[in-house]
């Protein structure tokens, strides 16, 4: 090895300098290329003389063949060039030459295993799809998908496949229960109409900023809207948020559970076409006696005829749009209607508060004119006979005017009741919650051990001895 290094140093020193010709740097394609030199190409500086001086056997080094990595056979390495190889030799060597690759055997094995995995995945998917496309095998599926029959035609198989896949994701698409509200109370305690209202951008507005984080604004007139109409309507709060996110906010709006008869959240919505839908047909109420107020039109897409349109509130102070709906809603409940949908359709395409005010003014003018025509001169003869002045007549009241006067009195009385009894009711509720927590498991191990066990039998009171 030392001799080889010494010979390389001698060759580097003894090599004469090569003068470069002053040729132009730019060559045109029209110029003729120089012919190849007939002299053999010297692949190494270690020629025979230098190897001999270093003590190497020149004949032995010539007899060794080149490595197989250079892609040439032994015969070609002895002096045969690429032009000397015949087509017959190329054809014979084609099957024996190893494909050049940078991958190791482990990488090739991994790719082969991955290919088998792909085949197994696609085969398993096809088998699972065929299993899902089978005929209905129970009466529940037949009843649920009564429009899809039995058989193994491509259309029926595809329909059953989609139906079963849809049933798999129904947990995220359908509400938590097929019926959202319990049965209504008995007639003496049942409200004549049900009012479904949204939470976001109707009663409150939530916004987030880097400076303050989340902030919630309550719409002006919300307390009066809920407290006053709660006397006549079964108010159902239907929020698009999850219960875990809006529970504290609802408790702030109704701390004594006085306004909302029921509370529904996002878990009770239906997911259709990328939108959250509040399906009123699942509320266990007469569809002719349900009204929904929601600024999101996508939530009311299934029953738009039961909806009162309203613009979303963005936190503007001094807003009165919600309070403007009270006269129409109190008039509607005073009419004892069997179906509110034709009445709401009559206001379609108009701004309901202003349109109702205009129509009410016309009806009031006619009502007062008829009343004065009937009662205007009653009692005038007695006043003239006795020589006293005529009493000043008050304007006649329409039926919903009388209801409004009595309703406001009852609303004030109820506020006074809550001011006195509300804290007591809140304290009683907190006490009951604390008792329930005390009766429950105190840690996870107790909760796991209590699964499947029967509740403790209450002790019977002993009779006192005589």
UniProtKB/Swiss-Prot annotation:
This protein's UniProt keywords: Membrane, Mitochondrion, Mitochondrion inner membrane, Protein transport, Transit peptide, Translocation, Transmembrane, Transmembrane helix, Transport
Ranges annotated as spanning the membrane: 113-133
This protein's encoding gene: TIM50
Topological domains annotated Mitochondrial intermembrane: 134-466
Subunit text: Component of the TIM23 complex, at least composed of TIM23, TIM17, TIM50 and TIM21. Interacts with preproteins in transit.
GO cellular component, one term: TIM23 mitochondrial import inner membrane translocase complex
Region feature Disordered, mapped onto this chain: 52-109, 436-466
Topological relation to the membrane, as annotated: Single-pass membrane protein
Pfam family membership, one: NIF
Presence of keyword Transport: yes
FCP1 homology domain segment(s): 188-332
Entry function: Essential component of the TIM23 complex, a complex that mediates the translocation of transit peptide-containing proteins across the mitochondrial inner membrane. Required to direct preproteins in transit and direct them to the channel protein TIM23, and possibly facilitates transfer of the translocating proteins from the TOM complex to the TIM23 complex.
Source taxonomy: Eukaryota, Fungi, Dikarya, Ascomycota, Saccharomycotina
KW Mitochondrion (keyword) present: yes
Protein's UniProt name: Mitochondrial import inner membrane translocase subunit TIM50
